[in-house]
Amino acid sequence: MPLIRIRGLHRVFGEGAARAHVLRGIDLDIHAGEFVAIVGTSGSGKSTLMNILGLLDRPSAGSYHLAGKDVARLSRDARAGLRNRLFGFVFQQYNLIPTLTALENVELPASHAGAAREARRARAAALLRSLGLGHRLTARPLQMSGGQQQRVSIARALMNGGAVILADEPTGALDAESGRQVMRLLSDLAGRGHTVILITHDTDIAARAGRVIRVGEGRIAGDSGTRAAGPAVPVLPETTGSRSAFLHALREAARSALAAIGASPVRTALTLSGIVIGVASVVAMLAIGRGAQEEFVKRASAIGTNWVVVGSDQDTRMPRRPLTLDDAMALKGLPNVAGVMPGRWEQATVRAGAFSIDTDIIGTDRDFRGVHGWDVVRGSFFSEADERGGSPVLLLGSTVAGTLFPDGRDPTGEFVFVNMSPFLVGGVLESKGLSENGSDRDKVVAMPLRSLESRVYGPGELSVIVVALQDMARLDESNALLREAMIRRHGTEDFWLADAAGAFAAAEADRASQNLLLGAVATISIFVGGIGVMNIMFITVRERTREIGIRSATGAAMRDILVQFLTEATVLSALGGLAGLALAVGIGAVAALGLGMPVVFSVTVALGALAGATAMGAAFGLVPAIRAARLSPVEALASP
């Protein structure tokens, strides 16, 4: 039984007036191990016949049996599998991928077959050495002569066994000596059992074959007849798809993608700018925002979080009663109240010797310590007797103490002047750092309320009443009781209530709004970057159309081409995402070390931004990848 049997083969291109009937009723048998030359002038149909024989194209009509199997109507991927296992192509223009080395070009068929990298690399190197190219393994096509490139092409054709070698004008682009070397190689392969089908217009070249078939006007014009052939080369066994094979293909696609991306670094960088900026902005800004939020919570928590502030409404259009010490005493008896601190805030100049400072003065009582958790680190708190008698005693905040006593000595027992009134320093308050709005909490002086009223400013209304709660889970209940108690005392709601939980909630709402805005900006930027990826992938497909044809000819299925270019888009986007993360870390470092801003990165946000950028790139790379996968192998090989 012949290896190749063709009956009534026709190939028609175009429709209507553009219709071209290239092959007309071809009948042909070729046995395994034959060396056949198909010779004809330009336009005779010989190249179209070769494309159909090599399963690069399908006939319009007729039958084609290969090793007893009808292959005329096979799917594209099924034909690719047969090409990979059975055929090896040697082209006039060599058709080597310029970005790959000689070794990598030869490996292509085995790579598409799913062969292990080490095994295929060893076989490719052995083939190149057998063809006298052992010293050119790492050379790229443009670094080699035409004869060397054609020998690389022959080695590639033999990579998976090359049971059938299809050579299309293999000497057409070579000098005479290189052409003779190539023909000797093909004759040697035929002698070793390979079925060699040579396509040529040169009758002298054709005469080197054991059988000459002449083609003219799409028909067989002459056939010297079948010659006896030796034992045929076995065909590479068919492999079935598996998860490991798919992962192998994915790894190879990723490796090829990195090589392709590295070939145009400037274009790659420009393409990725949108993704880089989008990822960097969202990760860095959210890190800065989260750092600011945590710093806010830390600062606010320094004076406790279990309090409610009662303040007087300052709307002068409405009648109101001032907050008084009696109001504070009345609130102490309410359920869930742990302490009540009356507070009157004023401004004063405090002096000690040659040093002075303008600072806040708080008139309060001993509940100041319990409500805000604000104790002394030196000396002692003022006593109940100090409160009742309005004693000239006060406590210095650490900033005030450091300003008035810069030599670092303990100011306890020293005298200072508040405006013009002398006071004894009873102690120094522990440091509470900055407030949530950035002011210095330690720039403060605390004294008994009666001392403030009798010795510095005279009688006046309270600024606020701060109520500490025992259980913050009952906050709503306590707020309602405080409101009722104050309305009973004042006859109207001429006051306001504020609590730490509300302040935290407002800050969190602001942060959420900022995050939403940042997310929107980053999404738009990444979206624009995705469009850039799509654009560059369309350009890449157009620039590498011949490469797609070469990969198809060496056995790449549509899925392989799709995975190749989709992986390239995905890797491209992932690199942009990683670059964005690196830029975000740089921005965060500048903010933290250079500007002193709190920065807290989130692994979840970073991974989410990276995944989003990668997914966006993959989505935008899908259409170009599909276009690449659907390219006709014949048309792709014919591209410039």
Curated annotation (Swiss-Prot):
Predominant location category: membrane
Keywords: Antibiotic resistance, ATP-binding, Cell inner membrane, Cell membrane, Membrane, Nucleotide-binding, Plasmid, Translocase, Transmembrane, Transmembrane helix, Transport
Top-rank EC class of the record's enzyme: translocase
Domain of life: Bacteria
E.C. designation(s): 7.6.2.-
PROSITE patterns the UniProt entry points to: ABC_TRANSPORTER_1 (PS00211), ABC_TRANSPORTER_2 (PS50893), MACB (PS51267)
TM spans (from-to): 269-289, 519-539, 560-580, 581-601, 606-626
Compartment(s) of residence: Cell inner membrane
Domain ABC transporter: 4-242
Membrane topology, record value: Multi-pass membrane protein
InterPro entries: AAA+_ATPase, ABC3_permease_C, ABC_transporter-like_ATP-bd, ABC_transporter-like_CS, ABC_transpr_LolD-like, MacB-like_ATP-bd, MacB_PCD, P-loop_NTPase
A Gene Ontology cellular-component term: plasma membrane
GO biological process, one term: response to antibiotic
A Pfam entry, by short name: FtsX
Assembly description: Homodimer.
The protein's name: Macrolide export ATP-binding/permease protein MacB 3
Organism, as annotated: Paracoccus denitrificans (strain Pd 1222)
